[in-house]
Structure formats: C-alpha cells, structure tokens
C-alpha cells in the first residue's frame, strides 16, 4: 500500500464514502517486501483505530468464533485478532485460549462517510456471503450470489451499466445470465 501513495488514496476514498473490505494479509509488508518492525499492519491500525494482538495459523479446530447474532463463523487458514472500538466488532472469538476469547476477528469501522470492513480470517461460504452483502448494502450496490463462490453486482455509471462478476474462492464457476439482461460485452476482453 506504500507505493504511489495508494494508502493515502484509499483513505481519502473511504472518507468520501467508499466501503473497503480488507485483510487478513493486506498491509502487512512495506514497499521492500519486509515486515514492519514496530507494528503488524502498515497504516490500518492508525487509520481505523485498532491494536493488532495476535496472528495465529488456524483451521477452526482449536478456535471458535461467532457473529454478533451468535451464529458460528468459520476460522479459515489464519486468524488476525485485534482490540479496538468494540462498537465495530462484527464477530469475535468465543472458544480457544483465554487470552484470545472475546477478541475481534471481523470488524467494521466508520471513517468519515465510508466504512472499512477488516477481515481477520479468510471468509468462506455463508461468511463470505455475509461480508459481501454487508459491504454491498453500505455501498448502495445490489448483490446476488450466483453460485457458492461467485458474486454478482449490478452497476450503473454515467455512460453505461453492467454486471460485475467475481469469483472469490479460486475454484472457477459459472453464472447464467437472464435473457432479460440483453446483449453484453466483456469490458476486459471485448
């Protein structure tokens, strides 16, 4: 995030109303590819007002977490845990070592007119759906899940409208578009 003032540009975009879904492996290395000596994240901790506590390799066998509505959420591959404004906590650790119980694993923080949704683990399935639905709702985007690992969002700009499809699990997938959607052109490949 240090190159070409990207961090500053993202922060300005969020303050102006953007919704940034970030983590868990974002902003952990400097522009030389080295870890920061004095903090885990480069600018995220100061920007959203949190203190990173732990980074733990975890596959959900030793640590359990729950969303604020008490439904279970998965802990997949890695767990970054932090403390900060508890109003921003979306999900927290509920079982594991006493030092980590109650720590935030997913959080959402209001910055200016926008929001930062910080992921402490790699969301899958229903957890990814929940995060995408939340982010799209705050961004004013209609969200639809096309398949288990594909999201679909309709977008309308000044000169054109379209659909953004994103595969987020590295598995490939298919999305069948309705005939009502009309003729479409892939803007990347033509």
Please provide the spans of the model-predicted regions:
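A conserved amphipathic helix/loop scaffold
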Residues: 2-190
């Amino acid at each position: 995030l240090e190159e070409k003032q990207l961090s500053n540009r993202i922060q300005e975009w969020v303050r102006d109303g953007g919704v940034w879904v970030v983590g868990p492996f974002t902003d952990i290395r400097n522009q030389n590819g080295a870890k920061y000596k004095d903090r885990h994240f480069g600018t995220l901790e100061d920007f959203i007002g949190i203190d990173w506590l732990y980074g733990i390799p975890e596959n959900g066998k030793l640590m359990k977490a729950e969303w604020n509505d008490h439904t279970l959420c998965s802990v997949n591959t890695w767990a970054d845990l932090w403390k900060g404004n508890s109003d921003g906590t979306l999900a927290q650790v509920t079982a594991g070592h006493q030092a980590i119980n109650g720590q935030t694993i997913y959080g959402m923080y209001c910055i200016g007119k926008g929001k930062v949704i910080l992921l402490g683990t790699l969301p899958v399935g229903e957890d990814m759906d929940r995060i995408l639905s939340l982010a799209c709702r705050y961004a004013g985007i209609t969200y639809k899940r096309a398949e288990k690992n594909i999201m679909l969002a309709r977008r309308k700009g000044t000169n054109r409208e379209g659909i953004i499809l994103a595969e987020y699990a590295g598995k490939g997938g298919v999305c069948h578009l309705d005939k009502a959607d009309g003729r479409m052109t892939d803007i990347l490949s033509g």
